[in-house]
Amino acid sequence: DPDATESETGTSEAGQSTQRRAAGDGALFARPQEFTDRSTPSSLGVAAETLALLDGFRTDRRFREVAEAVVATHADRIRASPLEHVSLVRATERVESGGVEVTIAADEVPEAWRETLGKRYLPGALVAPRPATDDGLQPWLDALGLDEAPPIWSGRDALSDEPTAYVCEGFTCSPPRTDLDEALSWLADRE
């Protein structure tokens, strides 16, 4: 509706949706949801995967709860025809497995580490740099309006003032490593 001036986002039995309302009207207009992937990915699947991916940056579980609700709501549809719902399948995989996360604690990421990450195939991995110390992290938290560090950064300081990598997969994390290749080899060792 071109005259819509307010929007609301919520979860219904049909899943995550955005509704627009004309000023003073009170009537809600629901935008149709695209469940299947066609020439473009399903917006519902992309949104659910993105929320699951970004959940580690929140101190509550709100993003994850919405992503879980979306994939649970559409579980039968996903199982019945996974090739038509690839984006929802990807979202389901991210919700269930947590994916791969690489947190780098360093005041400046070494160029060699950037090259390694650029050359290494880490499908769907989330790389999350952060300052080397909690004191350095505090201005970031203040800018984001957070009282405490989110899980992806919490307790992940640099070791001995050296850039440090924390590699996680499936909600399990490697020990902190000051050698990025060694940290990433932890992924291969898990297979």
Question: How does the language model describe each region?
Answer:
Residues D1-E191:
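Glycan-recognition and catalytic cores of secretory/periplasmic carbohydrate-active enzymes
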